[in-house]
């Protein structure tokens, strides 16, 4: 495991031995990261977040933060990310809400470009492309190959 000395990894986080974590990245206690994933510098991964294998997060992504929903009151909700996804600079991915299924999900082999946002309770299939600054409001569902 290649972890930069300035990265902050909670001892309760579960990272595969092949995960790479860049400078000043933060990984919280309830995070699981699968084999071959790369967490770039200044990326923050928190919340109840599960990241599959071979995912790449470019600098300044915010992953697994609380949903931007006025009804959210700190309930334990989740973010689940499949395998082989690429998240470019400054992407934000929020957890779900109890008013819906309680989980935000992204499938496999998605390409999420810079400054895109995937809000609470979104269900994104596999092989999707979200262009720069694309924003999915809460509860949006995208099928595969969108």
Give the predicted meaning of each segment.
Residues 2-146:
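Structural signal for interior beta-strand "rungs" in well-ordered beta-sheet cores
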């Amino acid at each position: 495991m290649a972890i930069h000395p300035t990265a902050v990894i909670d001892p309760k986080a579960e990272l595969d031995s092949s995960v790479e974590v860049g400078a000043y990245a933060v990984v919280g206690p309830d995070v699981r990261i699968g084999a071959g994933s790369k967490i770039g510098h200044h990326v923050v991964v928190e919340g109840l977040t599960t990241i599959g294998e071979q995912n790449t997060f470019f600098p300044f992504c915010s992953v697994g933060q609380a949903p931007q929903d006025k009804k959210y009151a700190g309930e334990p909700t989740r973010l689940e990310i499949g395998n082989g996804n690429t998240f470019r600079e400054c992407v934000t991915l929020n957890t779900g809400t109890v008013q819906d299924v309680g989980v935000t999900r992204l499938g496999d082999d998605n390409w999420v470009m810079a400054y895109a946002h995937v809000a609470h309770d979104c269900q994104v299939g596999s092989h999707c492309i979200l262009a720069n600054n694309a924003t999915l409001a809460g509860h949006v569902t995208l099928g595969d190959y969108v």
